[in-house]
Protein backbone atom coordinates (compact mmCIF):
# COMPACT_ATOMS: atom_id res chain seq x y z
CA UNK A 1 0.00 0.00 0.00
CA UNK A 2 1.38 3.41 -1.00
CA UNK A 3 0.67 6.67 0.82
CA UNK A 4 -0.07 9.90 -1.01
CA UNK A 5 -0.76 13.40 0.25
CA UNK A 6 -3.91 15.16 -0.92
CA UNK A 7 -5.17 18.64 -0.17
CA UNK A 8 -8.21 19.17 2.07
CA UNK A 9 -10.60 19.87 -0.81
CA UNK A 10 -9.70 16.64 -2.61
CA UNK A 11 -9.91 14.68 0.64
CA UNK A 12 -13.43 16.00 1.30
CA UNK A 13 -14.46 15.15 -2.27
CA UNK A 14 -13.21 11.58 -1.90
CA UNK A 15 -14.93 11.28 1.49
CA UNK A 16 -18.20 12.55 0.02
CA UNK A 17 -18.14 9.74 -2.55
CA UNK A 18 -18.34 7.05 0.14
CA UNK A 19 -21.14 4.61 -0.61
CA UNK A 20 -20.90 2.41 2.47
CA UNK A 21 -19.26 2.45 5.88
CA UNK A 22 -15.78 0.99 5.84
CA UNK A 23 -15.11 1.74 2.19
CA UNK A 24 -11.43 2.62 1.78
CA UNK A 25 -10.07 5.58 -0.16
CA UNK A 26 -8.56 3.11 -2.64
CA UNK A 27 -11.97 1.53 -3.24
CA UNK A 28 -13.58 4.93 -3.76
CA UNK A 29 -10.89 6.13 -6.17
CA UNK A 30 -10.94 2.84 -8.08
CA UNK A 31 -14.73 3.07 -8.48
CA UNK A 32 -14.53 6.71 -9.62
CA UNK A 33 -11.76 5.97 -12.09
CA UNK A 34 -13.62 2.98 -13.54
CA UNK A 35 -16.64 5.21 -14.24
CA UNK A 36 -14.57 7.50 -16.47
CA UNK A 37 -12.70 6.57 -19.62
CA UNK A 38 -8.93 7.26 -19.65
CA UNK A 39 -9.30 10.05 -22.24
CA UNK A 40 -11.83 11.84 -20.01
CA UNK A 41 -9.41 11.78 -17.12
CA UNK A 42 -6.45 13.18 -19.04
CA UNK A 43 -8.01 16.32 -20.49
CA UNK A 44 -11.53 17.18 -19.51
CA UNK A 45 -11.84 16.21 -15.85
CA UNK A 46 -10.60 19.53 -14.38
CA UNK A 47 -12.81 21.53 -16.74
CA UNK A 48 -15.88 19.47 -15.77
CA UNK A 49 -15.23 20.02 -12.07
CA UNK A 50 -15.04 23.78 -12.59
CA UNK A 51 -18.27 23.88 -14.59
CA UNK A 52 -20.10 21.84 -11.97
CA UNK A 53 -18.86 24.22 -9.29
CA UNK A 54 -20.33 27.19 -11.14
CA UNK A 55 -23.69 25.51 -11.63
CA UNK A 56 -23.89 24.42 -8.01
CA UNK A 57 -23.03 27.88 -6.72
CA UNK A 58 -26.07 29.33 -8.52
CA UNK A 59 -28.41 27.06 -6.54
CA UNK A 60 -27.75 27.83 -2.90
CA UNK A 61 -30.42 25.43 -1.61
CA UNK A 62 -28.86 22.41 -3.24
CA UNK A 63 -25.39 23.48 -2.16
CA UNK A 64 -26.51 23.56 1.47
CA UNK A 65 -28.10 20.13 1.03
CA UNK A 66 -24.87 18.69 -0.38
CA UNK A 67 -22.91 20.21 2.52
CA UNK A 68 -25.25 18.50 5.02
CA UNK A 69 -24.65 15.13 3.39
CA UNK A 70 -20.89 15.70 3.24
CA UNK A 71 -20.80 16.70 6.90
CA UNK A 72 -22.61 13.53 7.96
CA UNK A 73 -20.46 11.30 5.76
CA UNK A 74 -17.30 13.00 7.00
CA UNK A 75 -18.39 12.28 10.57
CA UNK A 76 -19.03 8.61 9.79
CA UNK A 77 -15.57 8.08 8.29
CA UNK A 78 -13.70 10.18 10.84
CA UNK A 79 -11.11 8.58 13.09
CA UNK A 80 -12.67 10.18 16.17
CA UNK A 81 -16.06 8.61 15.46
CA UNK A 82 -14.53 5.23 14.62
CA UNK A 83 -12.63 5.28 17.91
CA UNK A 84 -15.82 5.59 19.98
CA UNK A 85 -16.43 2.20 21.62
CA UNK A 86 -19.83 2.75 23.22
CA UNK A 87 -23.13 3.17 21.38
CA UNK A 88 -24.11 5.99 23.74
CA UNK A 89 -21.01 7.97 22.76
CA UNK A 90 -21.69 7.47 19.04
CA UNK A 91 -25.35 8.40 19.62
CA UNK A 92 -24.47 11.66 21.39
CA UNK A 93 -21.81 12.50 18.79
CA UNK A 94 -24.30 12.03 15.94
CA UNK A 95 -26.84 14.25 17.73
CA UNK A 96 -24.22 16.93 18.32
CA UNK A 97 -23.17 16.86 14.65
CA UNK A 98 -26.78 17.04 13.43
CA UNK A 99 -27.26 20.16 15.55
CA UNK A 100 -24.08 21.72 14.09
CA UNK A 101 -25.27 20.99 10.56
CA UNK A 102 -28.68 22.64 10.92
CA UNK A 103 -29.60 23.92 14.37
CA UNK A 104 -32.99 25.27 13.29
CA UNK A 105 -34.13 22.01 11.68
CA UNK A 106 -32.71 20.07 14.64
CA UNK A 107 -34.68 22.22 17.08
CA UNK A 108 -37.89 21.67 15.14
CA UNK A 109 -37.23 17.94 14.81
CA UNK A 110 -36.67 17.45 18.55
CA UNK A 111 -40.41 17.50 19.06
CA UNK A 112 -40.09 13.71 18.62
CA UNK A 113 -41.80 11.95 21.50
CA UNK A 114 -42.46 8.33 22.37
CA UNK A 115 -45.80 6.93 23.53
CA UNK A 116 -45.06 7.68 27.15
CA UNK A 117 -41.79 9.61 27.10
CA UNK A 118 -40.25 12.83 25.96
CA UNK A 119 -36.97 12.07 24.14
CA UNK A 120 -35.50 15.57 23.86
CA UNK A 121 -35.81 18.68 26.00
CA UNK A 122 -33.99 21.92 26.64
CA UNK A 123 -33.44 21.02 30.29
CA UNK A 124 -32.77 17.97 32.41
CA UNK A 125 -35.81 18.45 34.66
CA UNK A 126 -38.31 18.02 31.82
CA UNK A 127 -36.81 14.64 30.94
CA UNK A 128 -36.73 13.50 34.56
CA UNK A 129 -40.38 14.52 34.93
CA UNK A 130 -41.31 12.25 32.01
CA UNK A 131 -39.74 9.25 33.73
CA UNK A 132 -37.63 8.68 36.82
CA UNK A 133 -35.15 6.39 35.04
CA UNK A 134 -34.51 8.40 31.87
CA UNK A 135 -30.83 9.14 32.63
CA UNK A 136 -30.80 12.47 30.77
CA UNK A 137 -27.51 13.59 29.24
CA UNK A 138 -26.60 16.87 27.69
CA UNK A 139 -25.92 16.87 23.95
CA UNK A 140 -22.54 18.59 23.77
CA UNK A 141 -22.53 21.87 21.86
CA UNK A 142 -26.31 22.20 21.94
CA UNK A 143 -28.93 23.55 24.34
CA UNK A 144 -30.61 20.12 24.35
CA UNK A 145 -30.74 17.10 26.61
CA UNK A 146 -31.70 13.56 25.57
CA UNK A 147 -32.79 10.44 27.41
CA UNK A 148 -30.15 7.72 27.36
CA UNK A 149 -31.54 4.73 29.26
CA UNK A 150 -32.88 3.19 26.06
CA UNK A 151 -31.45 0.25 24.20
CA UNK A 152 -29.37 0.78 21.07
CA UNK A 153 -32.26 0.04 18.72
CA UNK A 154 -34.37 2.74 20.39
CA UNK A 155 -31.48 5.20 20.06
CA UNK A 156 -31.25 4.34 16.37
CA UNK A 157 -35.00 4.86 16.02
CA UNK A 158 -34.70 8.27 17.69
CA UNK A 159 -31.95 9.30 15.26
CA UNK A 160 -33.97 7.94 12.34
CA UNK A 161 -37.01 10.02 13.30
CA UNK A 162 -34.86 13.08 13.89
CA UNK A 163 -33.03 12.84 10.56
CA UNK A 164 -36.29 12.13 8.74
CA UNK A 165 -37.82 15.29 10.20
CA UNK A 166 -34.67 17.22 9.29
CA UNK A 167 -35.10 16.17 5.66
CA UNK A 168 -32.17 13.78 5.24
CA UNK A 169 -32.38 11.06 2.61
CA UNK A 170 -33.40 7.61 3.79
CA UNK A 171 -30.22 5.85 2.63
CA UNK A 172 -28.00 8.27 4.56
CA UNK A 173 -30.21 7.92 7.63
CA UNK A 174 -29.84 4.14 7.44
CA UNK A 175 -26.04 4.45 7.29
CA UNK A 176 -25.98 6.72 10.33
CA UNK A 177 -28.28 4.43 12.31
CA UNK A 178 -26.18 1.39 11.42
CA UNK A 179 -23.07 3.21 12.68
CA UNK A 180 -24.52 3.82 16.14
Swiss-Prot record:
| GO terms, biological process | negative regulation of DNA-templated DNA replication initiation; regulation of DNA-templated transcription
Q: Where in the cell is it found?
A: Cytoplasm
Q: Name one GO molecular function term.
A: DNA binding
The keyword DNA-binding is annotated on this UniProt entry:
yes
- Pfam families per the record? SeqA, SeqA_N
Recorded GO CC terms: cytoplasm
**SUPFAM superfamilies the UniProt entry points to:** Replication modulator SeqA, C-terminal DNA-binding domain (SSF82808), Ribbon-helix-helix (SSF47598)
InterPro entries in alphabetical order: Arc_rbn_hlx_hlx, Ribbon_hlx_hlx, SeqA, SeqA_DNA-bd_C, SeqA_DNA-bd_C_sf, SeqA_N
* Keyword Amino-acid biosynthesis listed: no
Predominant place of localization: cytoplasm
Q: Where is this region: Interaction with DNA?
A: 115-119
Instruction: Give the record's keywords alphabetically.
Output: Cytoplasm, DNA replication inhibitor, DNA-binding
Family of this protein: Belongs to the SeqA family.
Free-text function comment from the UniProt entry:
Negative regulator of replication initiation, which contributes to regulation of DNA replication and ensures that replication initiation occurs exactly once per chromosome per cell cycle. Binds to pairs of hemimethylated GATC sequences in the oriC region, thus preventing assembly of replication proteins and re-initiation at newly replicated origins. Repression is relieved when the region becomes fully methylated.
Quaternary structure and partners: Homodimer. Polymerizes to form helical filaments.
What is the protein's given name? Negative modulator of initiation of replication
Give the organism the record lists. Aliivibrio fischeri (strain ATCC 700601 / ES114) (Vibrio fischeri)
